[in-house]
């Protein structure tokens, strides 16, 4: 391993300047005042199985991507293509782990690059014609005065045929490169020209593929470093990326360059929630059903809901009972009022009857009532003073000495019975006759006089 690393390092000493083909910056804080860098401020695993992962968190800076079972596909389909993405966020020290499979093809370079605005850089690079090794490299502030930084390390298996996890773990004290679970390289701060060339400012994450063996865009040295000229009749050449787990070791919303030194101590962390972190939270929060929302509520909240629901039911029951009892009370009051009205009407009728009785009006006779009691009521006295004695009480009948008349001569006539053939009146010794007839009269002229 040491032999291979040293041999490849010797070659890289000459060729490494051309490795920077995909590195660039839009504003260099060492030379001008630049906008603050938007922070990631958290950790997240970006799974490249849909375009939304790229569009939400990355910019496609060259070419285009497709997506399949093996993740995002960075494909060179013809000469001059170099599909590349760059994160919309920065990390200020952190860890980046990419699960990927490098592209095949002589001269084709697959890369994982961390790059800052002042051209601090940490690299993983894979050459399509090399199926045994991967290159590690770094730069500080774009310094290319020496080319002794790249070191190649063997991979557990062919990096163009198998997926591996390639990791960069970066702090203010050192940089580590890992393949799967094996640490292959460590760069200490002091080992980079006492920190002057040590990568130490906020960085974006860049993933891409390009043709170092394209003679139209590269020098002969770059072509040799890439393993030779690319044969574009053998396209497509594809790098596959399943995921990138990124952790920002700083927390904040932005990173501010306070001077032009490029020293990590001059970077100010602006507090707050980053835009990217808020987007992650929004996108990763699942839409829950009502049942799931209920299941996720704390027990105290559920208890409060139960109590509130019970109170609501109790209130409804109370309202129902109140309405029922009030209506029942109203019905009882109405019934009592009706009964009082009927009782009053009866009392008024009785009062009127008694007034008529006292006045002897309407057939009432106080003298008759005194001797006969209630039998004097009910119509008996209604004939008094009228001269009417019924159909059998005509003058001719009285003159002919009919039994009815004869009976009437000895006492009052029965209102229902007519005596015939000498039958006796129902009045007997048990029912004494009145001492004075209720009325008397003569057939002469049909007038009635007392006997």
Curated annotation (Swiss-Prot):
It is found in: Membrane. Residues 22-241 form the GH16 domain. Keywords: Cell wall biogenesis/degradation, Disulfide bond, Glycoprotein, Glycosidase, Glycosyltransferase, Hydrolase, Membrane, Signal, Transferase, Transmembrane, Transmembrane helix. It is a single-pass membrane protein. PROSITE patterns: GH16_2. Its EC number is 3.2.1.14, 2.4.-.-. One of its GO terms (molecular function) is glycosyltransferase activity. GO terms for cellular component: fungal-type cell wall; membrane. The active site is at residues 121, 125. It comes from the Eukaryota. Glycans are attached at residues 31, 43, 49, 59, 130, 143, 165, 273, 366. GO terms for biological process: carbohydrate metabolic process; fungal-type cell wall organization. Belongs to the glycosyl hydrolase 16 family. CRH1 subfamily. This is Crh-like protein 2. The gene is crh2.
